[in-house]
């Protein structure tokens, strides 16, 4: 019998083992769709980004006008720009749900995959931040000023670091140029990290909703999960296109319709919605260095998840007490997101401080304590 080229060709064999004949647990739910959705988000962002980069000018005098030119004069430029801006929001929605799935079902016990995933999240956050500066509107400029200025809280080398990042003594043309270079470069780093992420995942195989070994019940990835992923793509593109066509500025900030002006500070400087939870944690501590440390810890705390796992069961499926705690954590993050969008005044200050404390306390203490308690009850 003639050898199947899909299984014998060196390149096709890799694709086959990753996307076609990959043995997958038979019971993985829709929560396992977000990996492929993140892949399609990344491809969409790179394609729309490349098209935008061909018309964009990374110069403080021309950046704002060039974005306006893209939307007015370039064929379907308005659509490409709207897809790129709102695609970033969907990227973050998918990655947050993907991380939430990992926390709920204990996927973080695949330590290598989990750690690369967190590095991916940090790279994505960096990419989104430098990208937000490029239109050179008011919120772009002041967001860049405020966030990069946080580096000055680092003892001894802080001020030098800020001036090095800015390329001068304030956010200006050198800053915009290097941010454009970084925004162009980082997505390709995300692609390579994603390949490493998948390599580690395929070493162990996927987890499943029951959190049990599924070696005895695997099915091929194609056609079952390729079809399921296609449905996921459709369900994601529908709201993305609805947003891009009908409500393109719904998630944006009105301040960004005003060209950057170093002499006028907007009344409320705030980042895009997907950073608001971390911004609320930053603002909840009335000390600059403390705030920066809390901001960093709010994401880096995810590295501790495998170390803090105290339960004898992997998933939360059969652990109602931990489930309640998990949903309280989600509610807490939503409160932080809301607080991040509010001005710094009572009662928002105290709500933010309580929510920030609860966030760290839940992850560091309540989850391990509850898991130990459940072990006592169940075993």
Curated annotation (Swiss-Prot):
The positions annotated for binding heme b b562 are 84, 183
The primary location reported for this protein is: mitochondrion
Query: Which keywords does this Swiss-Prot/TrEMBL entry list?
Result: Electron transport, Heme, Iron, Membrane, Metal-binding, Mitochondrion, Mitochondrion inner membrane, Respiratory chain, Transmembrane, Transmembrane helix, Transport, Ubiquinone
Known PROSITE patterns for this protein? CYTB_CTER, CYTB_NTER
Q: Does the keyword Nucleotide-binding apply?
A: no
Q: Which residues cross the membrane?
A: 34-54, 78-99, 114-134, 179-199, 227-247, 289-309, 321-341, 348-368
A Pfam match is: Cytochrome_B
Q: Cofactor binding mode, per the note? A: Binds 2 heme b groups non-covalently.
Q: Where does a ubiquinone bind?
A: 202
Question: What does the UniProt entry say about where the protein is found?
Answer: Mitochondrion inner membrane
Give GO cellular component annotations, separated by semicolons.
Answer: mitochondrial inner membrane; respiratory chain complex III
The entry lists its GO molecular-function terms as: metal ion binding; ubiquinol-cytochrome-c reductase activity
What is the annotated role of this protein in its UniProt record? Component of the ubiquinol-cytochrome c reductase complex (complex III or cytochrome b-c1 complex) that is part of the mitochondrial respiratory chain. The b-c1 complex mediates electron transfer from ubiquinol to cytochrome c. Contributes to the generation of a proton gradient across the mitochondrial membrane that is then used for ATP synthesis.
Summarize subunit and interaction data from the UniProt record for this chain: The cytochrome bc1 complex contains 11 subunits: 3 respiratory subunits (MT-CYB, CYC1 and UQCRFS1), 2 core proteins (UQCRC1 and UQCRC2) and 6 low-molecular weight proteins (UQCRH/QCR6, UQCRB/QCR7, UQCRQ/QCR8, UQCR10/QCR9, UQCR11/QCR10 and a cleavage product of UQCRFS1). This cytochrome bc1 complex then forms a dimer.
Additional observations: Heme 1 (or BL or b562) is low-potential and absorbs at about 562 nm, and heme 2 (or BH or b566) is high-potential and absorbs at about 566 nm.
Protein family per UniProt: Belongs to the cytochrome b family.
Q: What is this protein called?
A: Cytochrome b
- Name the gene that codes for it: MT-CYB
């Amino acid at each position: 019998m003639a050898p199947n080229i899909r299984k014998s060709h060196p390149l096709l064999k890799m694709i086959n083992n990753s996307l076609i004949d990959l043995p997958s647990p038979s019971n993985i739910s829709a929560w396992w769709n977000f990996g492929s959705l993140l892949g399609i988000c990344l491809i969409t962002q790179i394609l729309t980004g490349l098209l935008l980069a061909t018309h964009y000018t990374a110069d403080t005098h021309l950046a704002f006008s060039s974005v306006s030119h893209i939307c007015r004069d370039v064929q379907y430029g308005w659509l490409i720009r709207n897809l790129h801006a709102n695609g970033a929001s969907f990227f973050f929605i998918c990655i947050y749900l993907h991380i939430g799935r990992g926390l709920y079902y204990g996927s973080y016990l695949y330590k290598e995959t989990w750690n690369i995933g967190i590095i991916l999240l940090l790279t994505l956050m960096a990419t989104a931040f430098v990208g937000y500066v490029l239109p050179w509107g008011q919120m772009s400029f002041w967001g860049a000023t405020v966030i990069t200025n946080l580096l000055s809280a680092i003892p001894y080398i802080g001020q030098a670091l800020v001036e090095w990042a800015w390329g001068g003594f304030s956010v200006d043309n050198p800053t915009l140029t290097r941010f454009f270079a970084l925004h162009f470069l980082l997505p390709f780093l995300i692609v390579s990290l994603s390949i490493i992420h998948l390599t580690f995942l395929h070493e162990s195989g996927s987890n499943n909703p029951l959190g049990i070994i599924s070696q005895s019940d695997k099915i091929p990835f194609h056609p079952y999960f390729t079809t399921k992923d296609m449905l996921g793509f459709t369900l994601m593109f529908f709201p993305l296109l609805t947003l891009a066509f009908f409500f393109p500025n719904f998630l944006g900030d009105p301040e960004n319709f005003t060209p950057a002006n170093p002499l006028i500070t907007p009344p409320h400087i705030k980042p895009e919605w997907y950073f608001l939870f971390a911004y609320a944690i930053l603002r909840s501590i009335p000390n600059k260095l403390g705030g920066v440390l809390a901001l960093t810890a709010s994401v880096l705390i995810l590295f501790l998840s495998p170390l803090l796992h105290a339960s004898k069961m992997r998933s939360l499926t059969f652990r109602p007490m931990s489930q309640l705690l998990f949903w309280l954590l989600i509610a807490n993050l939503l409160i932080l997101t809301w607080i991040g969008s509010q001005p710094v005044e009572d009662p928002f200050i105290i709500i933010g401080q309580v929510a920030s404390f609860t966030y760290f306390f839940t992850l560091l203490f309540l989850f391990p304590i509850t898991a130990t308690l459940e072990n006592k009850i169940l075993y």
